[in-house]
Amino acid sequence: YKIDTIIDFAYSTKKTSTYQNYLTARDEVVSKGTKHYTAKECYNEENGASRTYNLTDDISLEILWNNYYFDNTTDNENNYSVITRFKYKEQYFLFTGDLEKEGETKFVEHYKGNFPSVELYKAAHHGSKTSSNDDFLNLINPRISVVSCSAGNNEYTDYYKNTFPTQDYINRIAKYTDQVYATSLYSEESEKPLNGNVVVSSNGDDVAVACTNNTTKLKDSEWFNSTVY
């Protein structure tokens, strides 16, 4: 497929081979005509970039404000995440990458009192304990939340309450919605689907959720009830 435009973070200090591979692949397609902008350029509408991209007559993609497009002092790379919001008619769908509490706090200060409720919130940082904080969730008031994670994976911690999606995320999101879905389930043999691929669709009035494995809400899943509680 042909890539028309790439939008990525405005700053990074990453030296990993994965990041270097991304830069190589990005620069190769840019050399063939793909447009490349940073989130900072988009938000400031510089160098040909736009803050809002109209994908169809009814669908737009907006690059939202993030303090760390401009302030490179955070010691957590996750806060450099590109924050995007899709709009379909009068409905909103929010993606915040791996944004952490520090970035969320700045976001709330910037948009406080002027942010519409969202139909979908793709949980930041895989449903970590350091994202999806109370003030942030109160601002966006999500109807549905989807977690892209390997539920119960102990790669980063052996304490089950801190594996993704974490107990802190679950407790906080539960104040706003029980429509929470997670993609995968950790297994020592191989990854297994929890909900599987999660597709959120809208006709402009109603929003529906379809999954390749099942549409069981996280709170009703066997994993949640046998492992978390």
What positions do the PLM features span?
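Core dinuclear metal-dependent hydrolase active-site scaffold
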Residues: 38-116, 120, 191-229
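Cap/insert and terminal regions of metallo-dependent hydrolase folds
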Residues: 5-8, 13-14, 104-195
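Active-site HxH/HxHxD metal-binding segment of metal-dependent hydrolases
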Residues: 1-41, 142
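Loop/turn elements at helix/coil->beta-strand transitions in domains of secreted/extracellular proteins
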Residues: 1-5, 30-35, 59, 88-92, ...
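Short, conserved catalytic or adaptor-binding loops enriched in Gly and charged residues
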Residues: 25-31, 52-55, 111-114, 171-174
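Solvent-exposed, acidic/flexible segments
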Residues: 15, 19, 77, 93-97, ...
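A generic structural signal for solvent-exposed, polar alpha-helical segments
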Residues: 25-28, 43, 132, 175, ...
